[in-house]
Amino acid sequence: MWYTLLVNKTQGEFFMKKKITALILSVIMIFSCGMVPAYAADDAGGVKKDNLLTIALGYIVETLIGAVDFCLGENESFVKEKDFVYDNFFEGTEEFITEAKEGAKWALGHSSVSLVPENFLDYDLYLGGFMCEKNMFTNDVREILDDMKVRVIALNDGSGRGTAVFATVDSIGVSNGDIRHIRGLLNDYAKENNLNSINIFATHVHSGIDTQGMWTEIIKKWPRNILSSAMRLSKLQLQGTDPEYMEFFYGRIKGAIEDAVASMEEGEMTFARKDIGERYFYNKNRPSATALDTELKRFTFTPDNKDATPTIILNMAAHPDVAGLAVGDEVNGHGVSGDYVYYIGETLGKAGYNFMFFNGAICGIYIGGVRGEEERRVDGPANYGREIGKMVLSLTKTEEEIKADSFLSTPDFVPTEEYITWYEGWTPVIETEVEPILNIRLQKVDFKVTNPLIRAASKIKLVNYLVKVKGFRDYYLTTEIGYIEMGKDIKIAMVPGEFCTDLAYGGASLTAEGSILGKDFEGKTLVDIFGEDVIVFGLANDAIGYIVPDNDYVMALNHDHYAETLSLGKNTASTLSKAFEEIVK
């Protein structure tokens, strides 16, 4: 998600966008007299009557924001199609194999480093992911609550087809332009070490240092950049991120990748997955979507070298909380946190494991289920992460084995009356060996940018995006999707944004009855394309915002359709679906 505007009330928070929405809707109603009936009549079709006003408001909102966008000028980030160059792209393995090479073994290297400079107060840094009213919408970094890391694994299947690198950053998102810049720094190294791909993900924490530029010193930079764009003076626009910090950021990730490759050890890979139930996940702001991925998916790499540290790779679909959010009357909301992901890693580290993390399809799906006493906002994600970490360690254990292990069975927090012991009724799952087969394919995709808010944001140059111009005001964002096969049965889709779970596994919002536009989604789900056990790695090699079904897309600015304001546009999901169909051909 590009941004979330939040304020707190007592010990909770609500979206400040409600206030903004009320103001916008007041303006809309002034301009919309007589327009709603006409629009509703034209587009009603199978739409429910209750949805007609929302659809009409969405049309009006797009029109009004579109008028603002029309007044803004393109900058050097907008490149005509004939001049467009997409460099530093890796295609993956040249060929796919179905059998492991004779005598082949997995090889994995791991590294993890902090992305927080020791002298962080000397930089111009802000928390990426929310703006707080009590902090004048500028959450400058003043303290470090835990850490912000990049975790890296280098993985090779022994087939001679090269090593794939995967890096996950504790941040709101890393834009494709920055990712390709990091790849560029590693071009020679990649050739020398036969790297077939370099893939960079984000955990999507909302309390990390802003690595995109949207959550900057908005009172200073936003007005200046907007005015400069309107006056066609793009050279006067200010970068959203701190340039010196970004150089530090690039260098740390580059070094971590090199360290992971250098530390590769041969060993065995196993896989286990367990459904932990809906208690630990909840749909916060996309009620039309009904699918929920409630599984923990764990890869465990055990090196042959007994002195080397094993590595756990975890995939789960839970949007991080806002660990650094201002709470109460004290001066806070300025703390960097890796959110629940950091505390999963802390727990696995105590048990003797390295940790790697991939988020899943997280559009609207937040953490929940753990109830412990909290003094600060960060305590909630910490409690959640530590408990999830213990579950990850226990996938193949019985309830009796867990109870006998004090580390696993003892809570790391003071439980409230509502707390339910996580291992009650726990049953183990079977762990299977993963044959050393790693196929990976990446593909460039052009997404048409129909959302005027995103077009305008690109023009004010706060985010590092390269926009392809195919015609007059015909804008596209070129990014990547990916497909991975591990062993003979595990299939993974790499998605460059916050993916609606219905689009992965099927759900009500794909149907005419369950969608706001009253028609079926015309694309295929990931299950349709790859099979029912497909795994999603989200925010992969880009952070393009929300990806929601075309038939459930309307920019009405209300709570149920908040995601549309931060989506590239109405055809993003169908474009993605078609691209995934192509990638498996």
Task: Label each PLM-derived region with a short phrase.
Residues 392:
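Glycan-recognition surfaces in beta-rich domains, encompassing non-catalytic CBMs
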Residues 30-31, 216:
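Hydrophobic alpha-helical membrane context
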Residues 25-29:
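Hydrophobic alpha-helical targeting segments used for export or membrane insertion
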Residues 1-15:
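Short, Lys/Arg-enriched N-terminal segments with co-localized hydrophobic residues
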Residues 16-24:
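Bacterial N-terminal signal peptides that target proteins for export
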Residues 31-43:
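Sec-dependent signal peptide cleavage junction
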Residues 42-201, 205-383, 396, 406-585:
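Conserved beta-alpha junction segments in alpha/beta enzyme cores
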